[in-house]
């Protein structure tokens, strides 16, 4: 049988869910194909969303009309704002989620979404006609035709699990690998390679001595992931727990190194640099006598815990004995061991910025198959791929986010311009404009753009306008209201800041590190009256947004000037204007890389590793610049 759709999304992980939802919400008749409907949006590793830079991506997904933030708020069992000791540009939200409820919540959203159908099956073949993807064929020999296909296969393409010397074919533990697609794509000229990731043991909480661990409770303030006016902290809030490995534990781990797939030659692919296995830690940091571990709850209705910091592919008996050498885990029982997994990925420099492959029209890649790691990075790519798959079917300009607009823009530009030689994880340090890309203002940066193309709906846009009007009113008040020393100095001294020598605008007082709008409102009744005008349900969020803009106004303006200068180079298009191999004045490396990556603009060309300033100057001269 044959069925017809506009967009087909293959794989229902975090990238696939966002891709399918975006395409369907924009009006495309969409099909989401997954091997197991009970594993939709499965949190394959830790049951947490967000973290450094990752939390900003989730806020951006939400601001654009995606669902990861909403689902996380609905299922969070602990919330924390990381990096509070640093400036707001570095603040990053993170939440522990109830793993089972996270799946149920996502499935409920997708099953009730207009324009979206779900099919349980394995895709084994793409239908390609005249250099363009036209559909897929499944393991049941069902043909689905479509104008665009988004592949979001995660770790399932020829996945191979390792536990000691035991090897198991699969995409996750006890789940089959996906076969056929990689081989077909190779035959079509797509370059592929292998990567590795891993996950820790899952522990039975009934066997843990919690009284010998340090408790880490969450925070219960107004912060959340979604900008929508939805409830959060709905579930019972649970603590995480910390402890440390010790020398006895390390000695047992060293015993197992001859059987470690990482050290006996079984695994040849590269794993994530910033999430090393416990065996890698004891080898790389041999002088360390302990490593911190975090025990994270999997949900409010289960005894299952995730042991963050103990990722391993060592034999089962070594993992268990090493854990039992730690006092809090001396009686530990586990639900399953840690394991490593190798899987196929595709060189992302074969993609355009809209995540469409250069070789095959209307075929999009998103998520871990592009060489990234993390739910958030996958979700951001999936959203962009789903939007652009819809655009390819119905017409319009590609949806591309700039490096000064979103961490998602930084992520995709890094992938398609620089490529990857190890699993890519987002950090704030990767963004040159991180003061512009704060977690508090993703809605201000992105929701208008999404609303104009029809993805963000009216209720989201109305909340944005309300927030902006209230925020800007506070800032205007601070810019125009004058304060006099005789009325405020005694209060300023109590706050630990110098008294005024003369009158000034309230804005200048807010700039001081010791002051906030709230503590100044206790000294300035007119400011209190202004703050009381803010909608009560979002009062803290809006006041915080106004305060950040005031305190960082100078830095924000300076960074925006730099971004505007760089964006002039983004406007100089070079795609299709050069036969790079014929430009002998370019270095050999430059000719090869420019030909392979085929950058759209001078700015993108300048970010390709190995392209020198002199190479860029040659191109500018040839353009008459």
UniProtKB/Swiss-Prot annotation:
Q: Which cell locations does it reside in?
A: Cytoplasm
Residue sites binding FAD per the record = 11-16
Q: Which cofactor does it need?
A: FAD
Q: Which UniProt keywords apply?
A: Cytoplasm, FAD, Flavoprotein, NAD, tRNA processing
What Gene Ontology molecular-function terms does this entry list?
Answer: flavin adenine dinucleotide binding
Q: Which GO terms describe its cellular component?
A: cytosol
Q: Which PROSITE patterns match?
A: GIDA_1, GIDA_2
Q: Which InterPro entries match?
A: FAD/NAD-bd_sf (IPR036188), GIDA_C_N (IPR049312), MnmG (IPR004416), MnmG-rel (IPR002218), MnmG-rel_CS (IPR020595), MnmG_C (IPR026904), MnmG_C_subdom (IPR047001), MnmG_C_subdom_sf (IPR044920)
Q: Which GO BP terms, alphabetically?
A: tRNA methylation; tRNA wobble uridine modification
Binding of NAD(+) occurs at: 271-285
**Coiled coil residues, start to end:** none
Query: Signal peptide span per the entry?
Result: none
| Gene3D superfamilies cross-referenced by the UniProt entry | FAD/NAD(P)-binding domain, GidA associated domain, C-terminal subdomain, tRNA uridine 5-carboxymethylaminomethyl modification enzyme MnmG/GidA
Q: Name one Pfam family in it.
A: GIDA
Keyword rRNA-binding assigned: no
Q: Please explain the role this protein plays, according to its UniProt record.
A: NAD-binding protein involved in the addition of a carboxymethylaminomethyl (cmnm) group at the wobble position (U34) of certain tRNAs, forming tRNA-cmnm(5)s(2)U34.
Task: Provide the family line.
Answer: Belongs to the MnmG family.
Q: How does it assemble?
A: Homodimer. Heterotetramer of two MnmE and two MnmG subunits.
Q: Which PANTHER family does the UniProt record give? A: GLUCOSE INHIBITED DIVISION PROTEIN A, PROTEIN MTO1 HOMOLOG, MITOCHONDRIAL
Protein name, please? Answer: tRNA uridine 5-carboxymethylaminomethyl modification enzyme MnmG
Gene that produces this protein? mnmG
């Amino acid at each position: 049988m044959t069925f017809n759709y506009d967009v087909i999304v293959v794989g229902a992980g975090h990238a696939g869910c966002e891709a399918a939802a975006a395409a369907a919400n924009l009006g495309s008749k969409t099909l989401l194909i997954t091997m197991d409907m009970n594993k939709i949006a499965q949190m394959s590793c830790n049951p947490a969303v967000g973290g450094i830079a990752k939390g900003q991506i989730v806020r951006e997904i939400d601001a654009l009309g995606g669902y990861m933030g909403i689902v996380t708020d609905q299922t969070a069992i602990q919330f924390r704002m990381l990096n509070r000791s640093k400036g707001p540009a570095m603040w990053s939200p993170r939440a522990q989620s109830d793993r089972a409820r996270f799946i149920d919540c996502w499935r409920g959203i997708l099953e009730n979404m207009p324009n979206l159908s779900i099919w349980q099956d394995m895709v084994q073949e793409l239908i390609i006609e005249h250099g363009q993807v036209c559909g897929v064929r499944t393991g049941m020999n069902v043909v689905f035709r479509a104008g665009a296909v988004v592949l979001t296969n995660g770790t399932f393409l020829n996945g191979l699990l390792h536990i000691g010397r035991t090897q198991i074919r699969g995409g996750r533990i006890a789940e089959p690998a996906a076969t056929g697609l990689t081989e077909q794509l190779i035959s079509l000229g797509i370059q592929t390679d292998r990567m590795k990731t891993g996950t820790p043991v899952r522990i039975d909480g009934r066997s843990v001595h919690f009284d010998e661990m340090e408790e880490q409770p969450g925070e219960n303030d107004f912060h959340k992931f979604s900008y929508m006016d939805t409830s959060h902290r709905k579930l019972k809030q649970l603590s995480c727990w910390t402890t440390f490995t010790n020398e006895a534990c390390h000695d047992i781990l060293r015993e197992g190194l001859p059987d470690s797939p990482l050290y006996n030659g079984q695994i040849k692919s590269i794993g994530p640099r910033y999430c090393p296995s416990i065996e890698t830690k004891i080898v790389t940091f041999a002088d360390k006598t302990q490593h911190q571990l975090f025990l994270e709850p999997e949900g409010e209705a289960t005894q299952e815990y995730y042991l963050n910091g103990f990722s391993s592919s060592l034999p089962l008996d070594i993992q268990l004995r090493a854990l039992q050498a730690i006092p809090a885990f001396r009686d530990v029982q586990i639900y399953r061991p840690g394991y490593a997994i190798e899987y196929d990925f595709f060189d992302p420099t074969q993609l355009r910025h809209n995540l469409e492959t250069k070789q095959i029209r209307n075929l999009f890649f998103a998520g871990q198959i592009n060489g990234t790691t993390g739910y958030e990075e996958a979700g951001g790519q999936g959203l962009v791929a789903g939007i652009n798959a819809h655009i390819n079917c119905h017409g319009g300009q590609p949806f591309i986010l700039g490096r000064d607009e979103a961490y998602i823009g930084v992520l995709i530009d890094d992938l398609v311009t620089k490529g990857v030689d190890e699993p890519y994880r987002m950090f704030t340090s990767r963004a040159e404009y991180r003061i512009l890309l704060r977690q508090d203002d993703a809605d201000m940066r992105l929701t208008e753009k999404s609303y104009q193309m029809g993805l963000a709906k009216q209720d989201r846009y109305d909340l944005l306008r309300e927030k902006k009007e209230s925020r800007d009113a506070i800032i205007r008040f601070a810019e125009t209201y004058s304060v006099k020393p005789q009325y405020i100095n005694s209060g300023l001294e109590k706050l630990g800041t110098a008294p005024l020598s003369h009158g000034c605008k309230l804005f200048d007082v807010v700039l001081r590190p010791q002051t906030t709008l709230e503590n100044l409102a206790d000294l300035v009744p007119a400011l209190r009256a202004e703050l009381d005008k803010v909608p009560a349900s979002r009062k803290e969020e809006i006041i915080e947004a106004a305060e950040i803009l005031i305190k960082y106004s100078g830095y924000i303006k300076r960074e925006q000037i730099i971004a505007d200068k760089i964006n002039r180079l983004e406007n100089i298009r070079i795609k299709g204007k050069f036969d790079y191999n014929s430009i002998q004045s370019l270095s050999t490396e430059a000719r090869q890389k420019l030909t392979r990556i085929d950058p759209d603009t001078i700015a993108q060309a300048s970010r390709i590793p190995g392209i020198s300033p002199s190479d860029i100057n040659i191109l500018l001269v040839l353009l008459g610049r």
